[in-house]
Amino acid sequence: MALVFVLLMISIVFVVAAISSRLVTLGERSARNDRDRQTAFQAAEVALSDAEIDIMGPNTASTQRVSMFGELPAGEGCSSSTESRGYCGRLTPAATDTSLLAIYKPIFENEDTSTRQWAGFGEFTDRVSDFPISSTGALPVKRPRYVIEKSLVSFRNRSNTVGKPFDAFIITAIGYGLQPGTQVVLQAMISKPVPTN
């Protein structure tokens, strides 16, 4: 009887130890995934900031295009030309799929440097060196990317009593975490005053 009791107690101790070990492993994995998602979120925020500098300035980069916004044509889709890369007109999903993922996923997944339609972090602000990346360690695996979409909302015809006219742009940015599959997409709307003479 005593032997059975001892074996039962040892079994209970082993089960409790196994469950505790599993909980610790799951907690550590959860913390790692959360850190990875937070890294991707912060990278997407940085891309939004870079796009805002791209649109509004101050920007002293040789590739800067602050004065071009409002003047660039905004047709359907996104531009892949070097000087207006990442600038888009109206983006619409296919008639059968109305999700935002269907609009932006093909744009951000294109890695071909000659046909890509997104702007990379620092491409037009000369801040590339401000965002280190690494395939190992605690840095994002890729630099964040963004597209700037000309909003259909127009505020160019506002009277002086209401306020100054401005153009509105929708920025969509994607940030990557420590793993390429960890991605966070953020959007923001920027309004840029239109110069009036």
Located regions from the model:
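Terminal alpha-helical segments
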Residues: 1-6, 10-197
